Amino acid sequence: MSKAAKKKSSKKRSGSEAAQFDQKTIQEFKEAFGIMDQNKDGIIDKSDLKDLYASMGQIAPDSQIDAMIKEASGPINFTVFLTLFGERLTGTDPEATIIGAFAMFDKKDCGKIKEDDLIKILQNKRGEPLDEDEVKAMYKGKPPIEGGEVDYKAFAHLITTGAQDELASA
């Protein structure tokens, strides 16, 4: 198969990624897209990503944002967004997905984020925020927080293995 045929073939496959998700998952992607589309124009662009990082108290370098934008072949509407994430999530487990999300806030690339950042993420009004009682319940379970830093890999493991019940009921 020629390089051009392979390229064309792989592009064809990527469009079917959306078909692999159930309605609940697609709704979750819509909510995530809505959070990222800060100006609500139906397209995620550089300014949306900058605003998203700023809302989380982060400053992302232009090079990092440009790299994110370049992953798409054109404007990032919901269909493109779903396809990009579909390609990434195929064969991945929820724990790896959550770790990847937390890693965006790991400035030092050390496997930890600030406890304050975790609370901001969990209480972000643009998604499905946890209320004060839910945050208090999380702390009763003794999440992996030490010295004001969260081991987000251990935290992701807890919430994806059913241990969140232990967190809430401890």
From Swiss-Prot:
Protein name: Myosin regulatory light chain 1
Record has Membrane as a keyword: no
Gene Ontology BP, a term: nematode larval development
Amino acids binding Ca(2+): 37, 39, 41, 48
Miscellaneous comment as given in the Swiss-Prot or TrEMBL entry: This chain binds calcium.
Pfam families linked to this entry: EF-hand_6
Any one GO cellular component localisation term in the record: cytoplasm
InterPro entries: EF-hand-dom_pair, EF_Hand_1_Ca_BS, EF_hand_dom, Myosin_RLC
Region of interest called Disordered, as start-end residue ranges on this chain: 1-22
Superkingdom as given in the UniProt entry: Eukaryota
Subunit structure: Myosin is a hexamer of 2 heavy chains and 4 light chains (two regulatory light chains and two essential light chains).
GO molecular function, one term: calcium ion binding
UniProt feature, compositional bias: Basic residues: 1-13
Ranges for domain EF-hand: 24-59, 93-128
SUPFAM superfamilies xref list: EF-hand
Keywords: Calcium, Metal-binding, Motor protein, Muscle protein, Myosin, Repeat
